[in-house]
Regions:
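N-terminal, cleavable Sec-dependent signal peptides of secreted/periplasmic/extracellular proteins
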Residues: 1-280
Length: 280
């Protein structure tokens, strides 16, 4: 806006006159606050350019006014900008022989170490919060891969996709760490050929079990159904039904069913799917 530009011009004029004085750090702080308002506006390119301005303003001010009593304003801002960040999206289920795909948004994580463990959890407890005991639910380490990440600098968010091939059926947990930094992200996933979809158009909810890759219906699969125990939050097995030649299993109408998961012989680790009143 015009007001913002006028204010910025005034700050620039003041800085040109008083820049050598220690109190000119206050002018720089005001400039930084002005830039902060723009930091999340506009497109990514604009945001990145504003970030770069804030970063260089902080660096220059720390060098120029090292003894100024509010210099920590700039140091704290740099620390916040350079804080490592890791946001990860991944599939709950991976087809055997395909990749576990991790979609990552990251800031200041030069290297990532991805470790994949067999999980000692029951598949229905994949999402359960075990708190401090979570680590004890990790079994054998099956893979460890280090990825070097592209970083334009130490403060801009970037994104990337990491792929790790998975072959054997089972329930797993990935744990991602950043060497030298206190940051860990973990999640569970299953390696299974089975996919389950529910629909509740009729009185009896139906489950269709298919091959995750081809979409072909699977006959003779077992669909285990569960409900949540409201007292302690655990998921309790209620019973099971089998799929017919069309890959369809009919769930009992009268039971309170909240989760299902398909199993077929050794393919027994698929993660639960929640059932909503109108299907998954």
């Amino acid at each position: 806006s015009t007001n913002t530009n006028d204010y910025r011009n005034t700050l620039d004029s003041l800085y040109n006159v008083y820049g050598k004085e220690p109190f000119a750090a206050e002018i720089r702080i005001a400039e930084m606050n002005l830039l902060q308002r723009e930091r999340y506006q506009g497109n990514k390119a604009h945001q990145d350019s504003v970030q770069a301005l804030i970063y260089s303003l902080c660096k220059e001010s720390i060098a120029q006014y090292p003894k100024y009593d509010r210099i920590n304003v700039f140091k704290n801002q740099l620390n916040e900008m350079e804080m490592p960040v890791l946001n990860i999206q991944s599939d709950n289920n991976v087809y055997p022989g395909k990749d576990l795909t991790l979609q990552i948004k990251y800031v200041n994580t030069p290297r990532l170490v991805v470790r994949i463990y067999k999980s000692l959890r029951q598949p229905e407890d994949a999402w359960r919060n075990y708190g401090k005991n979570s680590k004890s639910m990790r079994g054998e380490l099956v893979k460890e891969v280090t990825f070097k990440m592209n970083l334009a600098n130490s403060y801009t968010e970037a994104d990337s996709t990491l792929a790790i091939p998975m072959d054997r059926l089972g329930l797993y947990e990935y744990v991602i760490t950043v060497p030298g930094k206190q940051l860990t992200v973990s999640n569970r996933f299953s390696v299974s050929r089975l996919a389950a979809l529910t629909r509740s158009q009729t009185n009896n909810p139906e489950v269709l079990v298919t091959d995750l890759e081809s979409g072909k219906p699977i006959e003779g699969a077992t669909v285990i159904y569960y409900k949540t125990n409201m007292m302690n939050g655990t998921i309790q097995r209620q019973g099971e039904v089998k799929t017919d030649q069309l890959g369809i299993a009919i769930l009992p109408a009268k039971k309170k069913i909240e989760h299902i998961r398909p199993v077929l012989r050794e393919d027994s680790s698929s993660i639960i799917t929640n059932i909503y009143p109108y299907g998954t």
